[in-house]
């Protein structure tokens, strides 16, 4: 059975995860805006005559690739924190259930 110290550790971690998860989510949302901004800047920088060529050049640019990589990394961080939060919540739920069942047997 889980000890009260284990549960306290999970609760403390949940509290710490909250701020980090909010920042990670904000970074992910911001990276989407940056991706569009970088694309537009690269598109406008192109000296090619056709729109399709400008688009291809913008999408193939190093700046766009970097912005895309930053977005992916932000998503990974946000998802890892979301997963950790969910896992810790399930551990606490299991402890609550086990504690309730144990109280029922004691009476």
Which residues are covered by each model-predicted region?
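Terminal, low-complexity, charged helical segments
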Residues: 2, 106-107
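Short amphipathic alpha-helical "recognition" segments used for binding
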Residues: 12, 58-59, 93, 100
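Surface-exposed polar/charged interaction patches
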Residues: 17-20, 41, 61, 105
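Extended alpha-helical coiled-coil "stalk/arm" regions
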Residues: 24-56
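Long amphipathic alpha-helical coiled-coil segments
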Residues: 25-28, 32, 36, 69-102
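Short, glycine/alanine-rich amphipathic alpha-helical segment
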Residues: 48-77
């Amino acid at each position: 059975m889980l000890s009260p110290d284990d549960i306290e550790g999970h609760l403390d971690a949940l509290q710490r995860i909250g701020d980090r998860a909010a920042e990670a989510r904000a970074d992910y949302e911001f990276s989407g805006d940056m991706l569009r901004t970088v694309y537009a800047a690269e598109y406008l920088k192109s000296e090619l005559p056709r729109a399709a060529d400008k688009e291809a050049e913008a999408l193939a640019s190093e700046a766009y690739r970097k912005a895309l990589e930053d977005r992916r990394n932000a998503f990974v961080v946000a998802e890892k924190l979301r997963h950790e939060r969910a896992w810790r919540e399930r551990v606490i739920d299991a402890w609550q259930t086990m504690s309730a069942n144990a109280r029922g047997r004691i009476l």
